[in-house]
């Protein structure tokens, strides 16, 4: 969405796997934001979830496995299960790099420049060559 839909008071949940850390995002408008880290943040094998506190509750559907309740993980400090240490380490490296590069605003600007370049290249009738040093 270019703009968020009017949910008329319903909880907005979003899978942001494809756009995580590509631009600033107002997460206060969402109940749950989650995404796999494998595209923009780190190696496959981990999901980052941001869950509004009022949604972390013991009131779940009957039969929901313990492992699939937000409260289980929140109460355990996100360490209910063995953490994927390598993935956490690599994500940390990306977060530090991202901060050093200027944060999410800088990523949005880079994305805009990339879009302009690829649009120009797509609509050009001339071949485009880039010289590289060997």
For every predicted segment, state its role:
Residues 1-28:
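Catalytic PLP-binding core of fold-type I/II PLP enzymes
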Residues 24-39:
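A short alpha/beta connector and helix-capping loop motif
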Residues 32-36, 75-78, 125-130:
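Glycine-rich, charged/polar anion/phosphate-binding loops
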Residues 37-112, 116:
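Active-site C-terminal subdomain of aminotransferase-like
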Residues 106, 117-134:
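Conserved small-domain helix->loop->beta segment predominantly found in fold-type I
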